[in-house]
């Protein structure tokens, strides 16, 4: 595979970092280092006493981060759901001026056939973001029931043919001595099971997304990170979160809305609305931001990105 296959264009780079409203001497967390696009821009805006803690669970991302030689920067190999534990260990609970999360799978992960994320490239069916932990997709599919697989495809992929696909996958693994172990092998089984093809979308798109989300517990990770964000952030600390599919974006949107919504004071009550709502934890900053047409032309994978920004009060 040549180097251009692994070229990574950071999505909503300036918009996401602008959303952090960087204080030159602030302390920031990039919870999804990836290939370092956001981290490098954050560092360029920090003064000598600023600090950036980057987190990623992908060993390849850790290797990339280790090429950055900067006293203001440190990389930690863990999932972003562990941000509270990281802050506790560093004595930074409630002192973080901003957290950036760029959710989902990165272009290098998709383009590296050996990682098993892509239904367009043949490779081992792995799909783990952290290849040192947990079951691979192939190992899980070898033991899953039709009911459980159908639930995963429906819940995390919103796949209308979930039951058909689950039956085809489980049946193949039960009737063949050689199990499903390759990405293109799984993609073909899924395509053959789907009765109606969408000419704009590969029939395996939703299933691969669903299996990846399940294997990596992506929504659980996001829920934990959101739940603990308010404990971690300093007053006026920013949350800048990019999501790439409706399940993630819905969670982020609902979290921000729930924590920024005040109560309406019934007429006649001797209490001011401002007094009642002084403990609202978040302010939503602006509207959701989508990539420009120019960015989508330059990087088609940015098309589904949504950036939401909020600030702790």
Swiss-Prot record:
Enzyme Commission (EC) number? 2.1.1.199
Report the catalytic activity: cytidine(1402) in 16S rRNA + S-adenosyl-L-methionine = N(4)-methylcytidine(1402) in 16S rRNA + S-adenosyl-L-homocysteine + H(+)
User: Which Pfam family, just one, is annotated for this protein?
Assistant: Methyltransf_5
Name the top EC class: transferase
Q: Which residues bind S-adenosyl-L-methionine?
A: 36-38, 56, 80, 102, 109
Predominant place of localization: cytoplasm
Q: Which GO terms describe its molecular function?
A: rRNA (cytosine-N4-)-methyltransferase activity
Intracellular or extracellular location(s): Cytoplasm
Which terms in the GO cellular component ontology are assigned?
cytoplasm
Q: Give the matching SUPFAM superfamilies.
A: Putative methyltransferase TM0872, insert domain (SSF81799), S-adenosyl-L-methionine-dependent methyltransferases (SSF53335)
Keywords in UniProt for this one? Cytoplasm, Methyltransferase, rRNA processing, S-adenosyl-L-methionine, Transferase
Set out the biological process GO terms recorded for this chain's protein: rRNA base methylation
Q: Record's InterPro entries? A: RsmH, SAM-dep_MeTrfase_MraW_recog, SAM-dependent_MTases_sf
Family indicated by similarity: Belongs to the methyltransferase superfamily. RsmH family.
Its biological purpose: Specifically methylates the N4 position of cytidine in position 1402 (C1402) of 16S rRNA.
Name used for this protein in its record: Ribosomal RNA small subunit methyltransferase H
What is the originating organism of this protein? Haemophilus ducreyi (strain 35000HP / ATCC 700724)
